[in-house]
């Protein structure tokens, strides 16, 4: 008769030992999440509904920049100097930039409005073709972007943005090579209007 209580005691001790071990296994903290990816070197400006913010622009395009070869996307390489005597619209963008994607349709409408005029529309991505080539190609398959497209190397991006590390940015250059307008960000309903006004100003500038 004495063996029965002893067996019950052993069973109870075993249960007490197993339950906390089992609990520890269930509540063991999960592994920490993977490290967040490194952010792109330029930051997308948030979308707004007021006029785009003007930037302090360079007075003229430097000679070194105009003569600098630009690696084209899907076409022959070119230089800004190739379009001397024409109005230049230069848009800096990236495939990961949401405001850039939403800005493109407005700019495309403007480009079509000035078809046949002495206006050249150039879109330069700030991404690195060695690492981002496939992503940029996928982006361009999803959007209608009729600009002459190319890759802005670090020196060109730094000079065109005048040191401000944000995109999208847009510059309008008159036929004499003077930058008459420069702004960053995408403003819903405003960016296209502002671009139209800047181009008209550049075309009529004496």
Walk through the language-model features, giving the residues of each.
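Sec-dependent N-terminal signal peptides
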Residues: 1-23
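N-terminal "domain-start" segment that seeds a small globular fold
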Residues: 27, 31, 38-80
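Short pre-active-site segment immediately N-terminal to redox-active cysteine/selenocysteine motifs
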Residues: 86-88, 92-96, 128, 166
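Conserved redox-active cysteine motifs that mediate thiol-disulfide chemistry
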Residues: 92-109
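Thiol-based oxidoreductase modules, predominantly thioredoxin-like and allied folds used
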Residues: 118-133, 145-154
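Short, internal strand/loop/helix patches
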Residues: 137-169, 173-175
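Thiol-/selenol-based redox modules, centered on thioredoxin-like
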Residues: 169-206
């Amino acid at each position: 008769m004495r063996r029965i209580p002893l067996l019950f005691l052993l069973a109870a001790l075993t249960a007490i030992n197993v339950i906390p071990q089992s609990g520890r296994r269930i509540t063991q903290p999960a592994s920490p999440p993977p490290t967040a990816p490194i952010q792109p070197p330029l930051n997308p400006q948030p979308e707004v509904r007021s006029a785009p913010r003007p930037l302090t622009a360079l007075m003229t395009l430097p000679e070194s920049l105009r003569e600098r070869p630009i690696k084209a996307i899907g076409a022959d390489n070119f230089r800004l100097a190739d379009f001397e005597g024409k109005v230049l619209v230069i848009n800096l963008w990236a495939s990961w930039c949401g405001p850039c994607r939403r800005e493109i349709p407005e700019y495309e409408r403007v480009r079509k409005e000035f078809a046949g005029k002495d206006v050249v529309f150039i879109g330069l991505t700030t991404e690195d073709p060695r690492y981002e080539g496939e992503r940029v190609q996928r982006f361009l398959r999803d959007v209608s972007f009729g600009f002459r497209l190319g890759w802005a190397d670090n020196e060109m991006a730094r000079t065109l943005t005048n040191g401000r590390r944000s995109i999208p940015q847009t510059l309008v250059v008159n036929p004499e090579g003077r930058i008459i307008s420069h702004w960053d960000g995408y403003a819903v309903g405003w960016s296209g209007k502002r671009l139209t006004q800047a181009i008209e100003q550049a075309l009529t500038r004496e």
